[in-house]
Amino acid sequence: EKLSGSDLNYNDKGSTTIDHYKINNYAKEVNGNIDLRKALVKSSNTYFADQVQKIGVDSMIDVSKRFMFGQEIPFELKTAISPIPYNDKTTALELGTAAFGQGKDLVTPLQVALYTSAIANGGNMMKPHIVSEILDPSGKIIEKVTPEVLSKVADKKIMDTMKDYLKSSGDRNFAGFVKGKKVAGKTGTAEKTKDKIHSWVTVFYPVDNPTIVCTAFFEEENKIAAEMIPLVKKLVNKAIELGY
């Protein structure tokens, strides 16, 4: 929200230094001159670590609150609160690492699914439910959950731009997921320790009129997220088979 036009451009040299600490891209990949779209597609750590410095801590706290970080999510099952990883004592390095999902970031799969759904829904984060409707033995609907907006996270124009960017990421990572349809989304890999890796995959389908969000978290699987894509593909296609 704070950056636009040429502010979104960045020369990715494969690494950057913040507070005397070197941050590398995965495999130290050098992406050259990129914008936000390509940074998402290429998962450029350096782009987000440096660009977030222009945005600042206060703006990141504001955005985090709109995405329901630091707040209890109303849900039928107990779920942990995803804390806001920023405060007035946050250093430039902490801000930079949090911007690409490392550092003090702690987030639940439900939170990431809601985050993804907000982008898919043009900025509306919907209140989650386990059951959408209850049927009697004859199949008649006796109770149905009314959709409810939990948070308006950003203007539709901004979210539609993000949706388009995630489509570009999907074209690279999720091509062929569903026959004849496009899937948008993002992969993510976080290093817990040198030998323990967390992997994420989150997608929405179909791109033009989303009805499905699928988020998968693989704890300490020691595999990059791309290796987990086939499982998520099975989940999405099963949901389609069931009529969602």
Residue ranges and their predicted role:
Residues 141-143, 229-244:
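Short, gly/Ser/Thr-rich active-site loops of penicillin-recognizing serine hydrolases
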